Amino acid sequence: MCRVTLEQIFQHHITQKYVNRSGMVHAIAVAYHAFHHTSVDAATKAGFLHDIGHHTWYRNGEWDYELYKKNDIHAIKGAERAHKLLIRLGEHPKQAKEISVAILLHTDSFLLEQALERTPLQNIIKWVDEADEEPGGAHHYRTISYEKALQAIKRLDEMVDRELQTQQSTSSAPISTNEKAEKIC
């Protein structure tokens, strides 16, 4: 299997529809923050897609942040939507699930007052999302042109590729011919 790139995810019409609705600038910022932590490939994808399940909550033509906070299940919808998208693009099912569960657990908004033990990836996505938040949900309304967003995504893809190559070259385990073909394509 070839690595599904952030650029492939970014250019998909489902991503354009739903990530633009929830805030492309925020999605890219969270993906960049996530790069500096655990599994860079999974973390950047989960960071980029973490709000793909957002629904807009309006009352009398105005965004109602309190209504959103009270009724939100975007993490549930987003986990399902991201999983379906990643599988369609050819992501390995195990990684698609890991990314989707990190999206599911990136917020406590749908949980009923219970503590969860999160994996390192799940914690990172929660923390980096919170790091980019602005009062009243303003982080969802920053704008960026398609071209600038695409440049930022391509740059992040290059960073991920370099990190994966570094990890591969420092790994002491021999790599099979099939694994080499999978990572190179």
PLM region descriptions:
Residues 1-18:
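N-terminal export signals and maturation junctions of secreted/periplasmic proteins
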Residues 14-41, 49, 59, 91, ...:
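Divalent metal-dependent phosphate-bond-processing catalytic cores, especially two-metal-ion Mg2+/Mn2+ enzymes
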Residues 22, 70, 74, 95:
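Conserved acidic
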Residues 30-33, 72-89:
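An active-site-proximal "capping" alpha-helix that borders the catalytic cofactor pocket
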Residues 39-45, 89-104:
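Acidic/histidine metal-binding catalytic segments
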Residues 51, 55:
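Catalytic glutamate of the conserved HExxH
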Residues 60-75:
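Post-HEXXH active-site segment of zinc metalloproteases
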